[in-house]
Amino acid sequence: MADNLSQSFDKSAMTEEERRHIKKEIRKQIVVFALMIFLTLMSFMAVATDVIPRSFAIPFIFILAVIQFALQLFFFMHMKDKDHGWANAFMISGIFITVPTIAALMLLLGVNKI
């Protein structure tokens, strides 16, 4: 049991397959993060410039927000992992409570008049 203490941590803790998997996962997260930055810049450019017509700017930003929300859920909140069942259940139930609440508040406050 004490024989493993003489080895360095990276050699004793992970196999080569685990290291490759972690590197692949880090690479995916960096790519998704860069994609989210790009989506944010696209939404900023939609508002800052007149490239996109004003009537299409709000739906365009909303579409980008939904895409970014889905990417964040799957890659950073680990919704794609199978061993996060309870966390997934709570996040999904939170979405099902939040969306109707926001829609009801928008209707009550008259925000839907553009």
From Swiss-Prot:
The chain crosses the membrane at residues 29-49, 56-76, 89-109. It is a multi-pass membrane protein. It is found in: Cell membrane. Its main location: membrane. Its EC number is 7.1.1.9. One of its GO terms (molecular function) is cytochrome bo3 ubiquinol oxidase activity. It catalyses: 4 Fe(II)-[cytochrome c] + O2 + 8 H(+)(in) = 4 Fe(III)-[cytochrome c] + 2 H2O + 4 H(+)(out). This is Cytochrome c oxidase subunit 4B. It comes from Alkalihalophilus pseudofirmus (strain ATCC BAA-2126 / JCM 17055 / OF4). The lineage of its organism: Bacteria, Bacillati, Bacillota, Bacilli, Bacillales.
